């Protein structure tokens, strides 16, 4: 995508938003920070998108208050692309939102997240008629609190959504849906629990190899290619960054520890978003919904 320096324009800034700063106050005070300057460039049409590995809250605030929401969207959803770990499932990854932008959500927010996820899965991931699921504490239709029961019924009633029902956190990576929708608090907690379990299992395997004697070490040598394949599948660098869907342009957050591969894949991710016109299609859809209300 970027073969030489002719497509790179460096803009010097004089301020920096630190990781621990309060997001809204920081973007209002530090107008010459890279996050604010990038968001302003997108708003003014000097850039098509922006991504950063900086302060997550500041990126979200800049996206919301500077780039701006799509009309008809009440709250943007932070969208992660996660791997599907179940063999033979067909798909390699799925859309997961809201993964932490909104601690509390209403029914209409989750319905909007489902539509945002559908457009992303169709246009960026190339999934035809994506399966939409609701993250819940059981697969039965009557499971969950009042919010989840009501959202389940409303998703079921949406004719333009391929709603397949509830999915439990234990099946998060099992490939049961192409888009999994949740409120930000629940989704973030489930995601961190999954990440924590994966790290714990890796630690146990590593300790078992190191303390298991010669047989364990020989076994590791035979299985090393398998471990590398799993690491690539589950690695955060493989799938790009987390997109704040529901804004007027692509705004993407990458990990603070992002390596060159993560940056490359994030740029490719943004390129696909722009080329597929997923934002324009989303704007058109919600504009039509508003006109029919």
Please identify what each model-predicted range represents.
Residues 1, 7, 103-169, 178-179, ...:
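Glycine-rich phosphate/diphosphate-binding loop of Rossmann-like nucleotide-binding domains
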Residues 2-3, 27, 31, 41-45, ...:
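Solvent-exposed alpha-helices and their adjacent loops that cap or buttress functional pockets
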Residues 3-47:
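Phosphate/nucleotide-donor binding subsite
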Residues 15-16, 55-57, 137-140, 185-188, ...:
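Short glycine-rich anion-binding loops that position phosphate/pyrophosphate groups of nucleotides
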Residues 32-45, 49-63, 75-79, 106-107, ...:
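Short glycine/serine/threonine-rich phosphate/pyrophosphate-binding segments
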Residues 67-92, 96, 176-180, 184-292:
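Glycine-rich phosphate/nucleotide-binding loop
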């Amino acid at each position: 995508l970027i073969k030489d320096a002719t497509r790179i324009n460096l803009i010097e800034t004089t301020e920096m938003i630190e990781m621990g700063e309060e997001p809204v106050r920081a973007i209002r005070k530090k107008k010459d920070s890279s996050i604010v300057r990038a968001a302003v460039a997108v708003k003014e049409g000097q850039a098509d998108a922006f991504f950063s590995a900086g302060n997550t809250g500041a990126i979200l605030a800049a996206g919301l208050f500077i780039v701006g929401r799509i009309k008809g969207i009440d709250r943007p959803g932070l969208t992660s692309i996660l791997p599907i770990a179940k063999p033979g499932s067909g798909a390699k990854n799925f859309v997961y939102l809201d993964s932490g932008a909104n601690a509390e959500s209403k029914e209409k927010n989750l319905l909007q997240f489902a539509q945002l996820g559908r457009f992303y899965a169709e246009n960026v991931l190339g999934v035809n008629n994506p399966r939409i699921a609701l993250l819940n504490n059981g697969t039965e239709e009557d499971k969950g609190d009042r919010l989840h029961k009501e959202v389940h019924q409303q998703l079921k009633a949406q004719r333009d959504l391929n709603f397949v029902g509830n999915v439990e956190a234990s099946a998060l990576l099992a490939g049961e849906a192409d888009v999994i929708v949740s409120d930000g608090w629940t989704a973030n907690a489930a995601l961190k629990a999954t990440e924590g379990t994966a790290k714990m299992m890796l630690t146990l395997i590593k300790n078992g190899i190191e303390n298991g004697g010669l047989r364990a070490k020989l076994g590791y040598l035979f299985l090393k290619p398998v471990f590398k394949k799993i690491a690539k599948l589950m690695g955060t660098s493989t799938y790009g960054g987390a997109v704040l869907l529901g804004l007027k342009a692509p705004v993407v957050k990458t990990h603070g520890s992002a390596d060159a591969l993560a940056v490359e894949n994030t740029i490719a991710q943004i390129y696909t978003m722009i080329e597929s016109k997923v934002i324009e299609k989303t704007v058109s859809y919600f504009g039509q919904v508003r006109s029919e209300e």
